Amino acid sequence: MDVELEVSGFIQRLRHSRLRGLLVVGTGDVKAWAEKLAGYAGGDCALVSPSAGRLPGICRSWAPPGSIERILGGEYAAAIIAVPGLLRPSIIAGAGETVRSGGFLAIVADPPDRWDPGPPRGTGLYREYLFSAIRDNPVHLWIDDESGRIVSESFLEYTGVGAQGWSPGRYKPSPGSGVPRRLVSACRSESQARALESLARFFRGRWRSALVRGDRGRGKSYVIGLALAYAAWRRLIGRAVLVGPTPLSVQSVMAGLLRGLDVLGLKGHRVVRTSGGEVIRVSGPWFRIAYEQPDTAEPSPLVVVDEAAAVGVARVRRLSWRSGKSLVATTIHGYEGSGRAFARLLPNILPKPFIELELREPIRYLPGDPLEEWLYTVFMLRAEPQEPGDPSAARPVEVSREVLARDREVLRSVYGILVQAHYRNTPDDLLAMLESPHHRIYALEADGTPVAVADVVLEGPDVEEEARIALERLLYMAGSPGSGVVSWRVSRIAVHEDLQRRGLGSRLLRHVEAQARESGASLVTTMFSRHDVIPFWLKNGFKPFYVSPRYNRVTGEKNVALAKPLDSAGAEILEKASKTLALKLALAGSSIYRDLAAEKLALLLHHTPATAPPLYLTRIQARHLEGFLKGEVMADQAFDAVYIALLSTLLATRSWNPVEPGLVGAVARVVQGKPYSEVASIIGASTVDEAVGKVEEYIRGILEGARSLWSGRVIP
């Protein structure tokens, strides 16, 4: 058999059919085959390979395996993956979404009998799963160059009209759209053109925010760039901030912006690029659109967030509410998609009035494209929960990795619930579930369908240190070597969206605790950055022991870790760690925890053990404090004394109510040092004076009630 003839025939057939296909070449000479495939694509390709094995000049773009985002947003005749060893699902999913109609996604690897795409010391189930998935691909060719045989092949007959059928000349604009036809001609689908019209109305109207959503490959970012060009042309914007995870991630927006400015004939603008060539600022005589990193971005007359799930819901909320207008894009399904749960959350946090639009047609390939469907199915990029069974009959079960690897329906039903636990999911989550020997999946099953799922990770001395995410932080906070301590970390737990607030999550958690206790674990831990779920863990008897000093780069919130002891050793460690956190929250509240929501700081502090405060008043400070308590001076005039006395009271007692507005205001003002203008907003006071009055009244009351505590802590 002529291997090269088979490969070239497959590629030619793809071009004629306008389908996209998967090509897998098993070979002992990866470099030679990568060069051949790049030649078939005429160099119009993206190559994913290690820097050490980079093949200069064979493809238009290159990305190392750890930076697949370098090629995302690009469009190529082929994407070629030549990665030895571990082949992460995110590499396949990300590269596959860059291939245009009639092109191919190629994986160049070892021959099938020697190819192991999984990690070292894994279970081997990812290899089994991926091999089965390749054979199931409806348009693929898997060939073994060494033996000269076809491992498997398939070519689905498919007819359809895709985005290539889009004709700007036949497009009928909406009445009063105001968008020049020459700008519409820059669109690549009708849904892009409709979205452009809607965004033009958004810029002209009184809307505060707009949400553009859709699966990956629908042209969301590009049409936002066209809309920005329209707004600049109409002089509807001046200064705008463009926020995304990296400069690379916003290049589709910048490409649409520059294309739109060119089409509209807007000259005289200046383009600033990074040393790597990425556009980070476009400015003209009356407008300036500049990229800012999520953690440094400031409010602006217009803020544009490209990929909200990657920026983080907390940052999106902060930026949008403090800016004039907000334009936000989020990916529902696809590589780094957030799922519909997050897409449904965004309208609740964006300022009103608000418009929402969704792009449905792919711009690079046919709708219903078999490669897209394969990627979405195999790597759970469109996983949504199934219809739930009767929850009253639910029973706890452990779902084995073997079942997950071999029964795709079970995997989809489990994964469809788990994706609700995170704002942003990646295909690599699947790799961990199948390959890590320390992962466990537990579920509440009703009528054969999961209604609640927990993803659990075992952490102990036999696990690599970098994988002991919560345990290492717990031992650090406790100041304990913790040799031999084993904990179970609940990485994710979620309940079917139609069955929440019925106690199913707590019931499943109790089952996990029982299994952990039976195995000899000392604690169950968890760590997350979705602060809205803190009450769930506190309700179930967990104590906080760690809050990260920095934001989680995904959610824009700080990571919070909690634990529940299962034996005396675990209880002793957690007690020490939680007391350490109490001191950190109180004493570092005005620095590293100043940006933590005051109500969350109060709630977490209240659920730590009472501890003796290492704080004392001088005689002069005690005198100043008495003056404040008698109403002779305001709190700010005796702030140092109020600070010491209030922190001592909050640390040593737990009789205070963490949700009382006065307490929350006192925490915001005294512990965190926030201005009264912000305190007023936090506690719902209509004026600054009202906020001052409420906070000072509360402080006087709590300090009078704890007089015996702080009055005995005066330095002679």
Swiss-Prot record:
Residues 401-567 form the N-acetyltransferase domain. Acetyl-CoA binds at residues 493-495, 500-506. The keyword Acyltransferase applies. It holds the Pfam family Acetyltransf_1. GO terms for molecular function: 18S rRNA cytidine N-acetyltransferase activity; ATP binding; tRNA binding; tRNA N4-acetyltransferase activity. Catalyzes the formation of N(4)-acetylcytidine (ac(4)C) at the wobble position of tRNA(Met), by using acetyl-CoA as an acetyl donor and ATP (or GTP). Belongs to the RNA cytidine acetyltransferase family. TmcA subfamily. This is tRNA(Met) cytidine acetyltransferase TmcA.
